[in-house]
UniProtKB/Swiss-Prot annotation:
<dbReference type="InterPro" id="IPR003410">
    <property type="entry name" value="HYR_dom"/>
</dbReference>
<dbReference type="GO" id="GO:0042325">
    <property type="term" value="P:regulation of phosphorylation"/>
</dbReference>
<dbReference type="GO" id="GO:0005615">
    <property type="term" value="C:extracellular space"/>
</dbReference>
<feature type="domain" description="HYR">
    <location>
        <begin position="180"/>
        <end position="264"/>
    </location>
</feature>
<feature type="disulfide bond">
    <location>
        <begin position="94"/>
        <end position="120"/>
    </location>
</feature>
<dbReference type="GO" id="GO:0097060">
    <property type="term" value="C:synaptic membrane"/>
</dbReference>
<feature type="disulfide bond">
    <location>
        <begin position="74"/>
        <end position="108"/>
    </location>
</feature>
<dbReference type="GO" id="GO:0098978">
    <property type="term" value="C:glutamatergic synapse"/>
</dbReference>
<dbReference type="Pfam" id="PF13778">
    <property type="entry name" value="DUF4174"/>
</dbReference>
<dbReference type="GO" id="GO:0001525">
    <property type="term" value="P:angiogenesis"/>
</dbReference>
<dbReference type="GO" id="GO:0048870">
    <property type="term" value="P:cell motility"/>
</dbReference>
<keyword id="KW-0732">Signal</keyword>
<keyword id="KW-0130">Cell adhesion</keyword>
<keyword id="KW-0768">Sushi</keyword>
<dbReference type="Pfam" id="PF00084">
    <property type="entry name" value="Sushi"/>
</dbReference>
<keyword id="KW-0677">Repeat</keyword>
<protein>
    <recommendedName>
        <fullName>Sushi repeat-containing protein SRPX2</fullName>
    </recommendedName>
</protein>
């Protein structure tokens, strides 16, 4: 059955009147403006009666499609600039920096609706977390292509990516860096110092302040070690390196050092006197040292007994000399004779009834062969031989008077009846008696073991090979 064109136009008008009005719906962030429309996607069966009413020639069958921050590329069956006619298919895309949410392609349906919805959402990366001991600055917040540059606090070094860029997939490029404390602490030692040793000492007590230490990162110093003596220690002569090392929390370390120099003021080395020797305190030539002059057996000192090393590095006084001991036998008493030997010489008094006594001859012969050992031990021999009035007393070649001989015998209880001998120390005390001849070695052993002072013992060690 054929219908007239008028009838068709009336049916189309009725269809338009019966279709509900489409009110554009706008959602925040949808990408559509409030005065624009979009259609939800659904499947629609078009009745046969209505299908005959569809007209592809109507230019504006659906609402004009417009997507904010994006673009709709449409293809109409009519071609040309028809972008919303029935059957028009539009490809949806977003500007750079935006992501399409929804359908990529929609079509204008007979229901005058578009077959789906879509909008453009701005691409944003998540907010970057702050890093310990550091920060970052971004060129455009968290938006696409924004570059965030990291930096560390003073004293820290950045390890990892220095910059991160917000990419199109909404993720940041690279990885999260860290700030690492790699800078060592700052340490400053006290200045080097020099000090003179005190009088009669070879050391000096030196004090100093602790080093100045500061950490360039978090300010925390965990440990400071010292290599060398502590402040206030006694330092010997010479240069001494004092080293401090500081450690921070990250086990970085820094060291500094300074020098402690101790000087000893010294005088020129003294020479011992001829036929004598020196005993000195301390090192023997340092400031405050005292050197005493001593003479060998059979010699006596002429001049000052000691000299002192002064701060001017010169010795006080003048050196004495050792001269052969002069024994005055022309004295009025035995006491006057013995006083000349007090603290200077030991005495070995040999008494015999007559010069022909075999013990006497044997003893004198052995002693004459041991003059060196006797002199080293400061021993003077006095001989008392014979009977009055022919009795003889002598010290070396000097003769003693009969009165002195008699007093000596009485003081030391020496008989004329038989051979006897007495050993007297430097203080005038009877230390040993002999009734028979003894070898010089026996006498020397007794003196070395019991009568020598510490000074003389040291001297004996120095001279142990002298008489050999």
């Amino acid at each position: 059955m054929m219908t007239s064109p008028l009838t068709q136009r009336g049916a189309l008008s009725l269809l338009l009147l019966l279709m509900p009005a489409v009110t554009p719906t706008w959602y925040a962030g949808s990408g559509y403006s409030p005065d624009e429309s979009y259609n939800e996607v659904y499947a629609e069966e078009v009745p046969a009666a209505r299908a005959r009413a569809l007209d592809y020639r109507v230019p504006r069958w659906c609402y004009t499609l417009n997507i904010q921050d994006g673009e709709a590329t449409c293809y109409s069956p009519r071609g040309g600039n028809y972008h919303s006619s029935l059957g028009t298919r539009c490809e949806l895309s977003c500007d750079r920096g935006f992501r399409l949410i929804g359908r990529k392609s929609v079509q204008c349906l007979p229901s005058r609706r578009w077959s789906g919805t879509a909008y453009c959402r701005q691409i944003r990366c998540h907010t970057l977390p702050f890093i310990t001991s550091g920060t970052y600055t971004c060129t455009n917040g968290m938006l696409l292509d924004s570059r965030c540059d990291y930096s560390c606090s003073s004293g820290y070094h950045l390890e990892g990516d220095r910059s991160r860029i917000c990419m199109e997939d909404g993720r940041w490029s690279g990885g999260e860096p860290v700030c690492v404390d790699i800078d060592p602490p700052k340490i400053r030692c006290p200045h080097s110092r020099e000090k003179m040793a005190e009088p009669e000492k070879l050391t000096a007590r030196v004090y100093w302040d602790p080093p100045l230490v500061k950490d360039s990162a978090d300010g925390t110093i965990t440990r400071v070690t010292l290599r060398g003596p502590e402040p206030g220690s006694h330092f010997p002569e010479g240069e001494h390196v004092i080293r401090y090392t500081a450690y921070d929390r990250a086990y970085n370390r820094a060291s500094c050092k300074f020098i402690v120099k101790v000087q000893v003021r010294r005088c020129p080395i003294l020479k011992p006197p001829q036929h004598g020797y020196l005993t000195c305190s301390s090192a023997g030539d340092n400031y405050g040292a005292i050197c005493e002059y001593h003479c060998d057996g059979g010699y006596e000192r002429q001049g000052t007994p000691s000299r002192v090393c002064q701060s001017s590095r010169q010795w006080s006084g003048t050196p004495p000399v050792c001269t052969p001991m002069k024994i005055n036998v022309n004295v009025n008493s035995a006491a006057g004779l013995l006083d000349q030997f007090y603290e200077k010489q030991r005495l070995l008094i040999v008494s015999a009834p007559d010069p022909s006594n075999r013990y006497y001859k044997m003893q004198i012969s052995m002693l004459q062969q041991s003059t060196c050992g006797l002199d080293l031990r400061h021993v003077t021999i006095i001989e008392l031989v014979g009977q009055p009035p022919q009795e003889v007393g002598r010290i070396r070649e000097q003769q003693l008077s009969a009165g002195i001989i008699e007093e000596l015998r009485q003081f030391q209880r020496l008989t004329r009846s038989y051979f006897n001998m007495v050993l007297i120390d430097k203080q005038g005390i009877d230390r040993e008696r002999y009734m028979e001849p003894v070898t010089p070695e026996e006498i020397f052993t007794f003196i070395d073991d019991y009568l020598l002072s510490n000074e003389e013992l040291a001297r004996r060690v120095e001279q142990r090979d002298l008489c050999e």
